[in-house]
């Protein structure tokens, strides 16, 4: 075991049963990158019986997935472990490509990574483990942490009814990826090991170099797999959605120009509008029904409330009354204080929540995730479906 990690400890130790690690098999999701590679190597050093699993997601040769498959296979050969490949192209096409396309067509700005984590990656890994029966746990290279609930880690949160396992931010806030994991189930968390949860990115590189991993110097991917495959999100959109001309209107009602499809715009966008105005204008909202792009001054982008749907309560039971949270409405944004209020439908059931911010927020974007935290604990998250006009 690496001395540098002895003090930090591998994550999820509290959820591991007393059975010797050498008797337990773990499947590690391998993308071909340095993070997942190091996760596998660290688990091997820690005494686990490790096998790799790579999901084949994208159709076509020369894609990011085919390169990742080659790198992952080579890594497994270097480490002396089995490499499993799972053909997930059909489910990825249905759950990510199709739903991303539908989102853009509806005037939303989808979050493909969350779709993939929710309906493809972790579900496929979990199903693989359950089907194979020989594996006990799954692991990935995400910068986040999982802890089993104890009196110690929830003693300051009396207002919440916690589930058995907590999802927490990664120790490196600059690399924390918990935002993308808000859709995970307790079943997944109960089996999930995150070896990098307590590490900083620079430590990851150093350890990968020290261990001589072939991926140690591999550049970090900054793009979605859809972007890497198609070249840009614009090319993905052009490949899947037909252009449809519509109007660009100022929120005061004045027609300023035309566009070739609302799928090309997102809330807060300034560049590429192709209109003239005395001062900078930004996309304020998108009207799918009328095919109109509304623009406004920057001050008009600030809103106080948003409606959140399809909420997954990761670490707590669904609250029955309003709660105070720290909400993160995009991956790189800082969490902001707000109140979540249950919204009941005509059947008196709570299907949505209203998120009321302490301070007005700019460019609240339907289709993106709103993720709720209490300090380091990720409580839950859902999709922004609308925002207030105030």
Swiss-Prot record:
One GO term describing the cellular component: cytoplasm
EC number: 2.8.1.13
InterPro entries for the chain: MnmA-like (IPR004506), MnmA-like_C (IPR046885), MnmA-like_central (IPR046884), MnmA-like_central_sf (IPR023382), Rossmann-like_a/b/a_fold (IPR014729)
Keywords assigned: ATP-binding, Cytoplasm, Disulfide bond, Nucleotide-binding, RNA-binding, Transferase, tRNA processing, tRNA-binding
Active site: 116 (nucleophile), 225 (cysteine persulfide intermediate)
Keyword Transmembrane among record annotations: no
Disulfide bond positions: 116-225
Reactions listed under catalytic activity: S-sulfanyl-L-cysteinyl-[protein] + uridine(34) in tRNA + AH2 + ATP = 2-thiouridine(34) in tRNA + L-cysteinyl-[protein] + A + AMP + diphosphate + H(+)
DNA-binding recorded as keyword: no
CDD domains: MnmA_TRMU-like (cd01998)
Site (Interaction with tRNA): 142, 368
Subcellular location: Cytoplasm
Binding-site residues for ATP, renumbered to this chain: 29-36, 55, 141
Biological process according to GO: tRNA wobble position uridine thiolation
Pfam family of the protein (one): tRNA_Me_trans
Renumbered residue ranges of the record's region Interaction with tRNA: 175-177, 330-331
GO function term, MF aspect, one: tRNA binding
Function: Catalyzes the 2-thiolation of uridine at the wobble position (U34) of tRNA, leading to the formation of s(2)U34.
Entry similarity comment: Belongs to the MnmA/TRMU family.
Protein name as annotated: tRNA-specific 2-thiouridylase MnmA
Organism expressing this protein natively: Prochlorococcus marinus subsp. pastoris (strain CCMP1986 / NIES-2087 / MED4)
């Amino acid at each position: 075991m690496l001395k540098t990690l002895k003090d930090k400890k591998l994550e999820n130790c509290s959820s591991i049963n007393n059975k010797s690690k050498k008797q337990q098999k773990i499947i590690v999701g391998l993308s071909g990158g340095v993070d997942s590679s190091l996760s596998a190597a660290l688990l091997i050093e820690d005494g686990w019986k490790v096998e790799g699993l790579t999901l084949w997601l994208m159709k076509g040769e020369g894609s990011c997935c085919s390169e990742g498959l080659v790198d992952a296979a080579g890594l497994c050969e270097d480490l002396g472990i089995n490499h499993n490949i799972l053909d997930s192209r059909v489910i990825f096409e249905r759950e990510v490509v199709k739903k991303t396309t539908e989102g853009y067509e509806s005037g939303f700005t989808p979050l493909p990574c969350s779709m993939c984590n929710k309906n493809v990656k972790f579900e496929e890994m979990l199903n693989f483990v359950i089907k194979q029966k020989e594996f006990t746990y799954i692991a990935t290279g995400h910068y986040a942490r999982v802890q089993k609930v104890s009196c110690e880690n929830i003693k300051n949160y009396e207002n919440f009814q916690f589930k058995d396992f907590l999802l927490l931010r990664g120790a490196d806030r600059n690399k924390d990826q918990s935002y993308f994991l808000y859709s995970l189930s307790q079943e997944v968390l109960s089996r999930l090991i995150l070896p990098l949860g307590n590490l900083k990115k620079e430590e990851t590189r150093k350890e990968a170099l020290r261990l001589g991993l072939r991926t140690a110097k591999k550049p970090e991917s900054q793009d979605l797999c859809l972007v890497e495959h198609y070249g840009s999100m614009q090319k993905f959109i052009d490949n899947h959605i037909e252009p449809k001309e519509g109007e660009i209107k100022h929120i005061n009602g004045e027609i300023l120009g035309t566009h070739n499809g609302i799928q090309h715009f997102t809330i807060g966008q300034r560049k590429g509008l192709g209109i003239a105005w005395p001062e900078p204008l930004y996309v304020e909202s998108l009207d799918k029904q009328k095919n109109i792009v509304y623009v406004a001054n920057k001050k008009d982008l600030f809103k106080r409330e948003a409606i959140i749907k399809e909420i997954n309560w990761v670490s707590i039971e669904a609250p029955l009354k309003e709660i105070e949270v720290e909400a993160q409405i995009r991956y790189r944004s800082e969490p902001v204080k707000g109140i979540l209020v249950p919204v009941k439908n005509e059947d008196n059931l709570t299907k949505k929540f209203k998120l009321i911010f302490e301070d007005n927020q700019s460019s609240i974007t339907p289709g993106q995730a709103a993720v709720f935290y209490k300090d380091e604990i990720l409580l839950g998250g859902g999709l922004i479906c609308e925002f207030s006009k105030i």
